[in-house]
């Protein structure tokens, strides 16, 4: 028997986890046919795409992110510079064989690399960017990838053991609705020395050279009954060919006019790992 196509693999995975999915239009429970058509009782329907992704937006939405950005992000993340962060996340996950939702997953590399390190994990990535989800489905067939909006998410309540929110905007009300009892929200936010070598070269003596995410951390603490904060700080060597990719993938890089002048031998990753639970 030949290998299953990416689309067939996705259909199998959706069938196995269909109870997670709610219609983004009317919130009714979804079903899926053998042919890969997802539909609810009101007959709102959504097809699994050829590459295995699912488009679950109730209306079209624009994203500012390009295919080139996601290709750059894929290269940078898979170079290993975020491995320490990913391992720190894995160390905090308590549930056996967890179901994870990565909110704002982009091209999927963080979720895929985290799931690889956890026995029996099932990963679902959601992002408003169709380009990001197309890239994720192209790169990784082990996880499910959905174009969707967190403000109107296509999932039922109490569906996930872990919700990841990595360097991405959050919706804490929705996170708590989607979280299983005893589940964890794990959020990553930049700290003051994140990519400091880039900021020093590009934005010397300007407000962009330094910043703080103290308000984001405080809001997270206020949103959950139990929280924990861990600082992750390390510096890694940076290969020359990764520098333009790093500039392409980060919003900070978009504002640099003379990109060719940036020369980096190393880069600092400085993050807060926030863990929230409801008691």
Can you name each region flagged by the protein language model?
Residues 2-63:
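N-terminal auxiliary segments of SAM/dcSAM-dependent transferases
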Residues 17-19, 232-279:
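Conserved Class I S-adenosyl-L-methionine
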Residues 62-84, 88:
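Class I SAM-dependent methyltransferase Rossmann-like catalytic core
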Residues 97-106:
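Conserved class I S-adenosyl-L-methionine
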Residues 107-119:
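Conserved SAM-binding loop of SAM-dependent methyltransferases across substrates and taxa
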Residues 127-131, 151:
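Conserved SAM/SAH-binding beta-strand->alpha-helix loop
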Residues 151-162:
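A short acidic, Gly/Pro-enriched loop at the edge of an enzyme's catalytic core
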Residues 182-192:
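Conserved beta-strand signature within the Rossmann-like core of class I S-adenosyl-L-methionine
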């Amino acid at each position: 028997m030949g290998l299953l196509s990416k689309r067939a693999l996705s259909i199998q995975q959706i069938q196995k986890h269909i109870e997670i999915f709610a219609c983004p239009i009317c919130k009714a429970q979804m079903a899926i046919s053998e042919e890969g058509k997802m539909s609810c009782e009101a007959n709102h329907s959504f097809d699994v795409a050829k590459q295995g992704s699912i488009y679950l937006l109730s209306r079209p939405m624009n994203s500012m992110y390009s295919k080139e950005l996601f290709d750059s992000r894929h290269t940078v993340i898979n170079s290993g510079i975020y491995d320490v962060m990913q391992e720190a996340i894995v160390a905090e996950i308590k549930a056996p064989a967890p179901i994870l939702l990565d909110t704002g997953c982009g091209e999927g590399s963080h979720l895929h690399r985290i799931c690889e390190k956890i026995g029996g994990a099932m990963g679902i990535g959601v992002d408003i960017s169709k380009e990001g989800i197309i890239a994720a489905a192209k790169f990784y067939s082990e996880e499910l990838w959905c174009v969707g909006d967190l403000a109107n998410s296509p999932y039922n309540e109490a569906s996930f053991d872990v919700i990841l929110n990595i360097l991405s905007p959050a919706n804490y009300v929705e996170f708590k609705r989607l979280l299983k009892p005893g589940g964890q929200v794990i959020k990553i936010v930049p700290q003051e020395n994140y990519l400091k070598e880039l900021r020093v070269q590009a934005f010397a003596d300007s407000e962009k050279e330094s910043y703080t995410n103290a308000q984001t951390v405080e809001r997270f603490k206020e949103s959950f009954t139990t929280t924990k904060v861990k600082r992750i700080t390390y510096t890694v060597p940076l290969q020359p060919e990764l520098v333009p990719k790093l500039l392409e993938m980060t919003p900070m890089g978009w504002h640099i006019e003379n990109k060719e002048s940036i020369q980096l031998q190393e880069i600092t990753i400085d993050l807060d790992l926030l863990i929230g639970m409801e008691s």
